[in-house]
Amino acid sequence: MKNPNAEKNPAGIVVFLVIFGSLVLFPLVVTVAGSFMTEQAILLNYSSRITTFDLAAGLTEKFIKILLIPDPVSLEQYAEVLINQPSFLVLLFNSLKITLPVTFGALAAGILTAYGFTLWKWKYKERIFLVYIVVMLMPLQAVLVPNYIIAAIFGIEKSYLAIILPGIFSPFGVFLARQSMKAIPDAYFEAAKIDGAGNWYILFYILVPQLKSTIAAICMLTFIEYWNVVEQAVIFLDDYRLEPLSIYLSRLADGKTALIFAASCVYMFLPVWFLLSGQRDLEKGIELSGVK
């Protein structure tokens, strides 16, 4: 006799995924729709169930509908963000000044370090790699104070370098690249060494072409992480002119709602586009690394 509990229920799975996906996408839909609404339309339509208490009237409830289709459509807030507020673009470039060096630096450091862990034979390499894993699993807040102390010793605690250097030498890229390199058969390296190939030739002409998906995964995950940097910027950057865009958005909390929606859409456009355009490489890169 078959166990009915063991049989799969595709309809139930589909319903669950639809509900879960809707809950995940709803804030994004609200943000995008709100970015094309006027401030008056947002104040009129966007709200939640509000319960208030008055001594004379008692409990009162107010319901305001949530409108997800802009009516009328307005681009005024985008013009306000991109044209009338030059500081927004300055802070956007500040985010790029942090994100791009960390992304490319972490990629280069991760590939080179992973090469040494994978192909070279030296004592205690597995123990040292274990230290990498332990550091990778530590929460960011646990290493902020040591990072600040080290940055203060070198006199860079108030500059981008205090954020960029720890990001470049993050163990995550090393871990991901090494796991992918271990999946490549040793026959490739042995044949190359027999033909007289050196380390740089093996790295750039044998390893890198087979690690394209892993390289894309490292770049995407690092870019998104440091595009959304908050804690490091708050601690290290005391000059508002150096702040990234992620800090600017938190200051908009008391501003116009339509302006917040528009700024949020501009802010999330680049990482969302980056992620969607490289989704296949991201999935394949994580699959090759064996990360579950």
Region annotations inferred by a language model:
Residues 2-9, 13-292:
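A structural signal for multi-pass alpha-helical bundles of membrane permease subunits
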